[in-house]
Amino acid sequence: MSEDYIVRAMAADNQIRAFAITSRNIVETARQHHNTSPVATAALGRLLTGGAMMGVMMKGDNDILTLMMKGDGPINGVTVTADSHGNVKGYVGNPNVIIPANYAGKLDVGAAIGYGTLTVIKDMGLKEPYSSQVPLGTSEVAEDLTYYFATSEQVPSAVALGVLMEKNNTVKQAGGFIVQLMPFAEEEVISALEEKIAKITSVTDMLEKGMTPEDILEFVLGDLGVEITDKVPTQFYCNCSKERVTKALMGINKAEIKDMINEGKDIEVNCHFCNTNYNFSVEELKTLRKKY
């Protein structure tokens, strides 16, 4: 299976910056971890794909990006976290959501998420993380990220994200691109870009034709002198461990741990991001209580 990766590029004498990704493995790994329905896979897959690219836009080694789409739809929210090294993870509130296809016969991600808000949090090691919230427009993910870039970061952007499913509900293709205009972009560059982007029907169609992220950016920006500047491997990666979960348990007050011990039953702690369960025996809980 070919590896997932992100390419960065500049075009039109640095008036445009762009990112493109192939993310089939990321989305399939997420599907396997969470056992998501097709529409939940599409929703989570799109946000993971966008989040991975937005993560590598950050400069600091320890920077962390969190994207949260909270709507009134039955999926009960989608959350994704990414770092600046191409690692991304995420989950949905209701992985089993099943809703009818939309008018075009496609998975109805917008209806699954519903009306609500997109929250973007960037933790760059400062005292307070940067946080911004915008209303969801279509709730189809790509348009909502486009709106976020325009309103919160004042960067005109084109975002395209896609997940294509196999008949057996595994992931066939996933990927996307983000193309952004720099503040000094000239009018003719903007027009040429808008014209080209209007011709693009679907990212997954491009991937199905065997196009790589490089090919996609060449197609979108080829007439504008595109130059690939970097290639970054990307993966679904969760950094949870028993040790980290133990630290989280230590944050619970002692009385609660005592109640758990008195019940005399082992407890199970679940990591939302990768759906891994960590078991703690009564003996382990007693040791924890003594230690802290």
Give the role of each language-model region.
Residues 198-292:
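Cys/His-clustered metal-coordination modules, chiefly Zn-binding fingers
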Residues 1-230:
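Interaction interfaces in information-processing and related assembly proteins
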